[in-house]
């Protein structure tokens, strides 16, 4: 089974990774850990704006995401997965779908950040877009109330 995991720099990504690591998967399952450098979105319209990000900030963000992906790969290898990590530039919604298509993923795993109402409408939802347009099944890992409050979550 080929599993594509979308991670970002949020604490909820830890929940996604932990969920995948604890589940039972077919022998020989391979995980692609993907994180995206994304364009800056306007908080008012949700539209992507051509904002120039200073090179040193972009390099710092890329380094942070590469470390996140490397840590995720290590954690997954410890529990027996074959892994590959990537940091790509682009809109997370479209990048996840493109990689799922090109890699012929069997499953995409993403987190739900719990946005609702106006925030969801303005900012959009990566998980909703991926669920709607994915070429394969999608598992959305919800952040529970205990995790939002900083408590320990039950085992999936």
Descriptions of predicted regions:
Residues 1-52, 81:
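Small/aliphatic-rich secondary-structure junction motif
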Residues 6, 86, 111:
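Active-site-adjacent beta-strand anchor residues
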Residues 15, 95, 117:
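Phosphate- and divalent-cation-binding pockets in alpha/beta enzyme and binding domains
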Residues 19, 63-72, 95:
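Short, solvent-exposed amphipathic alpha-helices that sit
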Residues 22, 74-108, 145-156:
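Structural beta-alpha unit
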Residues 32-34, 84-88, 139:
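General small-molecule cofactor/ligand-binding pocket signal
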Residues 35-67, 146-156:
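Acidic, proline/glycine-rich short linear motifs
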């Amino acid at each position: 089974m080929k599993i594509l995991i979308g991670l970002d720099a949020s604490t909820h990504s830890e929940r996604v990774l932990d969920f995948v690591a604890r589940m039972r998967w077919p022998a020989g399952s391979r995980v692609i850990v993907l994180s995206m450098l994304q364009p800056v979105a306007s908080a008012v319209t949700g539209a992507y704006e051509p904002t120039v990000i200073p090179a040193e900030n972009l390099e710092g963000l890329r380094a942070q995401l590469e470390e996140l992906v490397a840590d995720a790969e290590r954690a997954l290898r410890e529990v027996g997965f074959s892994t590959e990590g990537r940091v790509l530039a682009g809109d997370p919604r479209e990048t996840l779908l493109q990689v799922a298509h090109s890699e012929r993923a069997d499953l995409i795993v993403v987190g739900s950040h719990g946005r609702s109402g106006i925030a969801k409408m303005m900012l959009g939802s990566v998980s909703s877009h991926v669920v709607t347009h994915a070429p394969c099944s999608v598992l959305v890992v919800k952040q529970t109330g205990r995790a939002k409050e900083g408590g320990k979550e039950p085992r999936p």
